[in-house]
Amino acid sequence: MQSSRFAHKWYFTGEKIMIRNPVTTLCYIEKENAFLMLHRIKKENDVNKDKWIGVGGHVEEGESPEDCLRREVTEETGLTLLSWQFRALITFTQEGYGTEYMCLYTSDSFTGILKECDEGTLEWVPKDKIRGLNLWEGDLIFFRLLEERNTFFSLKLTYTEDTLTEAVLDGCEDLLIHRQP
């Protein structure tokens, strides 16, 4: 079965047609040189099944990305963010699934007690172990950029099925140009 990196689709409910918002948020919460990662193993028909991702989700009607960020972090982790940094805008494209715009945040300021998540298992993963996890190829790129850069960046990631075919930084630098086939 072909999966997709993207979750927004048309939903038909009675007489109304609902379109899932193509704007999402993702946050990497940091503590003691580790990131809080979500191992997506609990949801059926999950496009992120068996992947390790940060915490986040779709912006809902009437929300700003920051409203979504706070809501999703609390819903999925039980933590309350006290502050955060808007680090990047990630544009995902895939033929047949449209475009998704992800607001990427980091935070090292939060309160609360970690709770069980119904989407997967939450785990503090040391930063030097992140690359060994089952991540989307594009996620590896923005992890590297988060480490290397203190400035905001824009990254366009294009997937063909589950394969990353394009990664363009700030609209001009092709990050896959030297990749081995």
Where are these regions (language model features)?
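Low-complexity, intrinsically disordered or signal/transmembrane-proximal segments
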Residues: 2, 8-11
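Conserved N-terminal beta-strand and adjoining loop/helix that marks the start
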Residues: 10, 14-37
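A conserved beta-turn-beta hairpin within the catalytic core of GNAT-like acetyltransferases
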Residues: 46-50
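Short glycine-enriched, charge-decorated loop/helix-capping segments at active-site entrances
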Residues: 52-58
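Unchanged
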Residues: 59-82, 92-146, 167-181
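Short, active-site-adjacent segments that bind or coordinate small-molecule cofactors and metal centers
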Residues: 146-166
